[in-house]
Amino acid sequence: MPTKKHRRKDPESPQEPSEKTKEQLVEGELRKLRQQFRKMVDSRKSFNFRSQQKITNQRKEIKTLQEEQDEITLLLNLIKSSRNLDLNEKNYLELRFLLQTKEDYEALIKSMKLLLAELDEKIVQMEKKIINQRQIFTKIQEANNPRKLQKQIHILETRLNLVTVHFDQMLTTNAKLRKEIEDLRHEKAAYDNVYQHLRRRLLTKKKTMNVAIEQSAQAYEQRLEAMARMAAMKDRQQKDISQYNLEIRELERVYDHETKLKSFLLIKLNDRLEFEEQSKKEEALKAKKYGKKSKGASFESYEVAHLRLLKLTKTGNLNQLIEEFLAKEEKNFARFTYVTELNNDMEMMHKKIERIQNEILRLRSQQKSSHDDSYSILRELEEKLKKTTEEADMYENDYREITKTLEYLKNSVENLFKKINCDATKILVQLGETGKVTDINLPQYFAIIEKKTNDLLVLESYKRLMEMEVAEAEVQPSFLNPFWGGSALLKPAEPIKVIPPVLGADPLSDKLDEVEQPLDHSSLRQMVLSHYATRESRNRDSMPEKGDELKSKKKVTV
């Protein structure tokens, strides 16, 4: 009866939780719907607020645009009025008249400027002509005095010698400076090459250092991962060992219980066998005694055993007892197989742990060796980097000093170029030139400066010559001897016609103008000597002609 009640209650029990779950689901859906409703209400409010803001902004914009339209229409009406149109017409006519007058005056000013420029050119030409005439007149006057000419020639030769010496010194210094500049350029190129080579080496060293750092970081990460794996495996091993110990204890307890049950059942079976043997013996005796009553006795013995077995069972069901016995035997067999499997697993785990420990030791040794190698490589790289940085700093300092000297030379060349008013059109015509002195156009600036110095030296010599001529012209005439009274009766000597030299055609200056490249000391010296030789040959040719003329004149007078 109690079993029936229990069976009736079983189908009713799942209905109660299903209703509760349904109510919970309904409540959850209601909450979700309420939340959605609240969100929809909030979104609607926000949308209404935004739409109202947009409408107000649009109204404001419409209002401002309407005001602007009103202002524009008002301005258009004012502009289109007849009074404003008349004023505009008057202003237009006045402006046109003023522009016409401006153009006329500008044309007049241009014509007057052209006239003034022509007059200035004429004045300059006339002044040049006057200066040339004066120079020719002074030359003619000075040419009549041969002593003065000889003295002047001697002075000019000495001055020319001094100037040539000074010029030679300038050329030697210039050549030395050029050589120094070339040496500095070569040194700069060598330092640049070394700097680039060291920079490339530094970059490669940095790359190798980065690779070594990455490898060391990877090795460190691998070591950390291996250590984490080792720790995890140790924890897992400890957990497995504790679990294994618990399971072994449980199995030992179950095994002890089963052994006790088996021993109890064996004792019971032995008792039953002894009882059956005694019963068999009694039955045999009874069979011998009674003969015919053997079958009844055996049946009675079976009944006695059956009753004893029924006493052993609580419910009085032998089938249930047999099933329980078989189930226990199966459980014991399954536990025995499980214990054997666990033993095998434990052996495998021990082997695996030993293998992992050996692998960990090997990895540690490899990591130690790699760490030592990487440390030694890093030390070598640091030493090399230190050396390369020191060399790079040294080369950079040399490069800075060279650049400073070059900058000083460039600045001095530029200042000298500006002071002596050299013409830089030939350099500026070239592509990429900005008017500044650079490493590329420095020889061109030197050539122009050299040419200008030659011109200045020629002008200086000419100026000194003119000063000497002026000084000699201002000297008073020599004292006349009073005792030479008869000298006044003598016929005065006729003036010697001396052809004045043409000042415009100077062969040396023409040759210097023709030369485009800077001259060496030897070439310039040769040019000056050839010019001096030609001038002396001319003087020698002119002297006998003058002597012949004087002789002929004396003969005529006699």
UniProtKB/Swiss-Prot annotation:
InterPro entries: ODA-DC/CCD, ODAD1_CC. The keyword Coiled coil applies. Residues 1-26, 531-558 are annotated as: Disordered. Keywords: Coiled coil, Differentiation, Spermatogenesis. GO terms for biological process: cilium movement; outer dynein arm assembly; spermatid development. GO terms for cellular component: axoneme. Residues 48-289, 339-416 form a coiled coil. Residues 9-26, 533-551 have a biased composition (Basic and acidic residues). The keyword Iron-sulfur does not apply. PANTHER family: COILED-COIL DOMAIN-CONTAINING PROTEIN 63. Plays a role in spermiogenesis. Involved in the elongation of flagella and the formation of sperm heads. This is Coiled-coil domain-containing protein 63. It comes from Bos taurus. The gene is CCDC63.
